[in-house]
From Swiss-Prot:
Disulfide linkage: none
Protein name, entry field: Glutamate-1-semialdehyde 2,1-aminomutase
PROSITE patterns assigned to the protein according to its UniProt record, in alphabetical order: AA_TRANSFER_CLASS_3 (PS00600)
Matching InterPro entries: 4pyrrol_synth_GluAld_NH2Trfase, Aminotrans_3, Aminotrans_3_PPA_site, PyrdxlP-dep_Trfase, PyrdxlP-dep_Trfase_major, PyrdxlP-dep_Trfase_small
Gene: hemL
Main location: cytoplasm
Organism per entry: Haloquadratum walsbyi (strain DSM 16790 / HBSQ001)
Subcellular location: Cytoplasm
Pfam family, one: Aminotran_3
Signal peptide: none
Length: 446
């Protein structure tokens, strides 16, 4: 394996792009390998090395790197008819109607250009709709590069988590631990009349895939209803990945007031969306008074790719395939970790998976255990080992993942996300043979 071309490209990139990348998560150590093209479930780098890909663009690529023919045909058709028009298009209406038919919370939807733009708009909408300022977020949750949610601390001592954000912004945000019923209850007892919304991922999908414990999402639904606050689910990652076309909210049986989307809803193209109850969403301009607009919003090529991607999933065995392989992969990694690396906790569901390296070994591997990744099941003998909060993942052996495990898997030509926090994904292009090969690599690397 040689990296000569990637190294040369990295040196060039360093002179014109900060850190040599356009997204910090791509800055793998000691330097990134530069991808030239994708092929099915694989990517090929600038040096011609082929990797089995589980990054999948960090989530948007439900089908891998070869789109189904109807999706490709739609993309080509809309591209040939002109890049954009500055006016509404029929495909926007079709895509919006499809999403509204399948996602429980969505009666109306506004398409935007990224997941970050979706969550920024959702926070503004919640404040405009309720007339309140405070937003509750989960520690370890991620809602894009926006000032309202890049915070750290606790409700009494909140600070921005990055330079460049005034402290005055952070005072309107209340961070609490995910899965902590007492903490969220206390926040509402103290600030309930000022809380515009609770903004949370139904699963902490950007921080080790932390699933909700039984009753937690239901408790959020109850508290927000009681205090006339909004419940916003950030399904940028889980949308149309977990729970199929109904998204994670349908899998867990909890319907939020507003949902944000990104990634899969655009079929692999830049996209975001805010959907929810009609009486809330119509507060966006021009029907309401909460300003929201964008030059590229509802871009026809993106709308066509997203609509045809979801339509194909509705008509074929896409979710059965990816979820079966995801369960098989998590189960296989669980068996390997039990034998070779007791400190490794396998997390994920449906077609998502990750391995978290805890600093202490498992309390037990005997008796009733989750066979294909942590399910937050109290009867499981490893329940106490399973991450419950973002802090549980942040305190794990992140350096083992980045400096040892990721490099070992790359040596086996397996492309995983480069830190312990980001999820990995099985696509429709993956096969049972790919899973076999991946498990052999895990066996060696663990």
């Amino acid at each position: 394996m040689t990296d000569e071309e990637s190294r040369a490209l990295y040196d060039r990139a360093l002179s014109v792009m900060p850190g040599g990348v356009n997204s910090s998560v791509r800055a793998t150590q000691p330097y990134p390998f530069f991808i030239e093209r994708g092929d099915g479930a694989t990517v090929i780098d600038a040096d011609g090395t082929r990797y089995l890909d589980y990054v999948m663009g960090y989530g948007p690529l439900l089908y891998g790197h070869d789109l189904p023919e109807p999706v490709n045909a739609a993309i080509q058709s809309y591209t040939s008819e002109g890049p954009m028009y500055g006016a509404p298009t029929p495909i926007e209406v079709e895509h919006a109607e499809f999403v509204a038919r399948h996602v429980p919370s969505v009666e109306m939807i506004r398409f935007v250009n990224s997941g970050t733009e979706a969550t920024v708009s959702a926070v503004r909408l919640a404040r405009g709709y309720t007339g309140r300022d405070k937003i509750v977020v989960m520690k370890g949750g991620y809602h894009g590069a926006q000032e309202s949610t890049l915070v750290e601390g606790d409700p009494m001592h909140v600070e921005p988590s990055t330079p460049g954000i005034p402290s005055s912004f952070a005072k309107h945000t209340l961070p609490v631990p995910f899965n902590d019923l007492e903490a969220i209850t206390t926040v509402f007892e103290t600030h309930g009349e000022d809380i515009a919304a609770v903004l949370t991922e139904p699963i902490l999908a950007n921080n080790g895939i932390v699933r909700p414990v039984d009753g937690y999402l239901e408790h959020l639904r109850s508290l927000t209803t009681e205090h006339n606050s909004l419940l916003i689910f950030d399904e940028v990652i889980t949308g149309f990945r977990v729970g199929g076309l109904g998204c994670a909210q349908s899998k867990f049986g909890v319907t939020p007031d507003v949902t944000t989307f990104g990634k899969i809803i655009g079929g692999g193209f830049p996209v975001g969306a805010i959907g929810g109850r009609a009486d809330i969403i119509e507060h966006f301009t021009p029907s309401g008074d909460v300003f929201q607009s964008g030059t590229f919003s509802g871009h026809p090529v993106t709308m066509a790719a997203g609509y045809e991607s979801l339509k194909y999933a509705a008509e074929n065995d896409v979710y059965d395939h990816v979820n079966r392989l995801g369960e098989r992969l998590r189960g296989g990694i669980t068996d390997i970790a039990t034998d070779q690396s007791p400190s490794a906790i396998v997390v994920g569901l449906d077609s998502m998976f990750k391995t978290v390296f805890e600093r202490e070994g498992s309390t037990t591997d005997d008796g009733d255990v989750c066979s294909a990744g942590c399910e937050q099941r109290e009867s499981c003998m490893r329940y106490d080992d399973c991450p419950k909060t973002g802090a549980d993942v942040s305190s794990a052996e992140t350096e083992r993942w980045e400096r040892i495990f990721w490099q070992e898997m790359r040596d086996h030509n397996i492309f995983l996300t480069a830190n312990q926090f980001e999820s990995q994904f099985v696509s429709y292009a993956h096969t049972d043979e790919d899973i076999d090969r991946t498990l052999e690599a895990y066996k060696s690397a663990l």
